[in-house]
Regions:
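Short polar catalytic/cofactor-binding loops
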Residues: 8-12
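FMN-binding flavodoxin-like domain, especially the glycine-rich phosphate-binding loop
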Residues: 3, 13-16, 20-157
Length: 157
């Protein structure tokens, strides 16, 4: 079982979140994790994993163009990602910066692929968020999210 974490990060905040989510995935035995910047990720890699988590900074209330391009390219695999586990996370410059709309724009693409999305009954309903550099709360959210993603991968695979 493997989870791929794909992200775009200009300042390093989203990258740090990706690494923290990977830390959470590693808590679950028999689930591997790979963390890659979107610029170094081929869309075909989505076919070879059981879980995908995508992270983006918030630009104008939505995902970065680099993430959008990656998701647009994934259309050629429509129907082939169904049943895989998906998730999203985001960082922004300020508290009203659009983290939830960014996450929802990513999740929309994953749901259209028929992926199973991991939510939370805690405060980070749609996925972890960070305002600026991840604080302790955001760090814990990321680690817990990664663990929940890995546990869901085991359940559905």
């Amino acid at each position: 079982m493997k989870v791929l974490i794909v992200y775009h990060s200009r300042t390093g905040n989203t990258r740090e979140m990706a690494e923290l989510i990977a830390k959470g995935v590693k808590r679950v035995e028999s689930v591997e994790v790979e963390v890659k910047p979107v610029q170094e990720t081929r869309v075909e890699e989505l076919l070879n994993v059981e879980g995908v988590v995508i992270g983006s900074p918030t630009y104008y209330g939505s995902m970065a163009a680099e993430i959008k391009k990656f998701l647009d390219e994934s259309v050629k695999f429509h129907g082939k990602l169904e049943g895989k586990v998906g998730g999203a996370f985001s960082s922004s410059a300020n508290i009203a910066g659009g983290n939830e709309t960014t996450i929802m724009s990513i999740l929309q693409s994953l749901l259209i692929h028929g992926m199973i999305v991991q939510g939370s009954s805690k405060g980070d309903h749609y996925g972890p968020v960070s305002v600026g550099k991840p604080d302790e709360r955001s760090k814990n959210q990321c680690i817990e999210y990664g663990q929940r993603i890995a546990e869901l991968v085991l359940k559905v695979s």
